[in-house]
Amino acid sequence: MENVFDYEDIQLIPAKCIVNSRSECDTTVTLGKHKFKLPVVPANMQTIIDERIATYLAENNYFYIMHRFQPEKRISFIRDMQSRGLIASISVGVKEDEYEFVQQLAAEHLTPEYITIDIAHGHSNAVINMIQHIKKHLPESFVIAGNVGTPEAVRELENAGADATKVGIGPGKVCITKIKTGFGTGGWQLAALRWCAKAASKPIIADGGIRTNGDVAKSIRFGATMVMIGSLFAGHEESPGETIEKDGKLYKEYFGSASEFQKGEKKNVEGKKMFVEHKGSLEDTLIEMEQDLQSSISYAGGTKLDSIRTVDYVVVKNSIFNGDKVY
């Protein structure tokens, strides 16, 4: 891999506009059997999503993935969501008790619409075995597997039965995998996405490194079906994190899934904690993302998300912000 690049190195090139207003542009996306309002999903992290936010997202036709850090609550969560006619979308790990959990779901005839196998290094036999286990016991569930960063990994997980793969090793704002281990897609996440997407035959979820709404459009251009976002969704009124006041400003905590705050111990730590400025309501952020993406589609010369996939682009090394600090 030479000529790698990241989000801030790329500018998409406009094509002739065919709409009178950006409101004519359609940002919806289909993943599995369901259609969603935006190709965006809040990260399945404890300071980003909880039951209340999951319910809000599902009711308003946004995709969501519940985190896996309160495993005992998952069964009641699935029941609760499905009893309201909403989709149930959960996360699992790969430890022994997760195998039992999947069998328990099957025994109780509970089939979540989406199951995300969520571990830091998803190119592993542990993940392959779990994909096969879920497909055997819950064949109707749509399985997202990750996280990975290479075409080989995408192909192997797809071949094992994954319905989608999640791409991104350590590019997140509160992820320190790149620093602690020397490995990952941090700094070249967009190029890694492009590399993986070329090998994929099923949808890819780009996960990590998104710092602006324009990065969503860039992810679509380079092959993502859905884009997972953490830091841009942190710090909202509804966010689960704790609120603190500093110098008269409100902040909310945001921490990585493998951080000591998450694990309750300082062992194999690959995440950190930060405080992000309070952002107001989640609804406002989602509306702004939709409007910005509608504008992206109009610049791409189309009316649908797919029009972004065919635009030209240039690589401008680290200069698109001209020294402006946008994040």
Curated annotation (Swiss-Prot):
Active site: residue positions: 175
Key words, A-Z: NADP, Oxidoreductase
Top EC group: oxidoreductase
Enzyme Commission numbers on file: 1.7.1.7
Residues that coordinate or bind NADP(+): 204-227
Domain of life: Bacteria
SMART domains per the UniProt record, alphabetical: IMPDH (SM01240)
Stored PANTHER family: GMP REDUCTASE (PTHR43170:SF5)
Protein name: GMP reductase
Organism: Bacillus cereus (strain ZK / E33L)
